[in-house]
Regions:
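Solvent-exposed loop/turn segments connecting transmembrane beta-strands
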Residues: 29-35, 60-74, 101-111, 136-145, ...
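Membrane-embedded beta-strands of outer-membrane beta-barrel proteins
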Residues: 39, 80, 113-115, 149-153, ...
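Transmembrane beta-barrel domains of Gram-negative outer membranes and organellar outer membranes
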Residues: 23-29, 33-90, 94-100
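Cleavable N-terminal export/targeting peptides
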Residues: 1-21
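Short loop/turn motifs that connect adjacent beta-strands in outer-membrane beta-barrel proteins
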Residues: 20-21, 47-49, 85-96, 120-129, ...
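Outer-membrane beta-barrel "beta-signal"
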Residues: 232-244
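Transmembrane beta-strands of outer-membrane beta-barrel pores
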Residues: 26-32, 45, 56-60, 99-105, ...
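Outer-membrane beta-barrel transmembrane domain signature
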Residues: 135-215, 221-225, 242-244
Length: 244
């Protein structure tokens, strides 16, 4: 999952610098041992903004042979979100209505509705986005507590280094899950909460060679009860990002 472009271009839009951005990220996941790509885009207009991303996972031959067809292996996950804001000239300009759909090739689907709040520093270099939503599971999965919280951040030129960016997101949502208990196969672990965070760091190395589209860096996926894994997991990734 990637949401880091949201606050980056939202700040630019408010600063009247740009209203759209599309980028492609390519990662190697050291924890899982395969590559992923992420295509994401943000587009602002007079009625709010639209954001989407598509993650695709490139499994190895061994992964495919040992994993069922209905899983994320060699599959895709996507989110599309819309913030609706018809009051940009009012004191509530930073508060928007939020609708979202999350889906995957392995059957997962969630529709969300809620509110979104945008915050920024005076120079727009440090930006934050918070959304609280009611989520409804479609087809696959259920939630005793059907609530989702999303926080997104972006910090530009950190440590005074031009072109160095720290960004990321955290998702916390209700999801009823069962995990195998190796000590008691008749009583699996049961959880009702999932957490996923992906802090990223990028450096605009391309500015040194006349290609400012190119960034290098990576991310760390931190999760709790996520993607079939009970408990805490940490998956570091190295990657590149091309901004169109």
């Amino acid at each position: 999952m990637k949401k880091t472009i949201i606050v980056a271009v939202a700040a630019l839009a408010l600063a009247h610098v740009a209203s759209a951005q599309t980028n492609l990220q390519m990662f190697y996941d050291f924890g899982r041992g395969y590559a992923t790509t992420t295509l994401e885009g943000f587009y602002a207009d007079n009625w709010g903004d639209t954001f989407f991303f598509i993650d695709h996972y490139y499994a190895t031959k061994a992964d495919r042979e040992n994993t069922g067809a209905g899983t994320a292996i060699n599959g895709s996950y996507f989110e599309i979100e819309r913030n609706l804001n018809f009051w940009k000239d009012s004191p509530l300009a930073d508060l928007s209505l939020h609708v979202e759909y999350d889906g995957a090739t392995w059957g997962a689907g969630v529709a969300c509705v809620g509110v979104n709040y945008f915050m920024h520093s005076d120079d727009f270099k440090n930006i934050y986005n918070v959304a609280v939503m009611y989520d409804h599971h479609i087809g696959y999965g259920s939630a005793s507590v059907p609530v989702k919280f999303t926080g997104v951040w972006g910090m530009q030129d950190i440590f005074g280094v031009e072109g160095l960016r720290f960004s990321g997101f955290i998702d916390i949502w209700g999801l009823d899950s069962q995990f195998a208990n190796p000590d008691d196969i008749l009583h699996p672990y049961e959880t009702n909460l999932t957490i996923l965070s992906e802090p990223q760091i990028w450096y605009n190395v391309g500015k040194h060679i006349g290609v400012e589209n190119l960034n290098v860096g990576g991310e760390v996926e931190l999760s709790l009860n996520f993607a079939g894994n009970h408990g805490f997991m940490c998956n570091p990734c190295i990657g590149t990002k091309w901004v169109f």
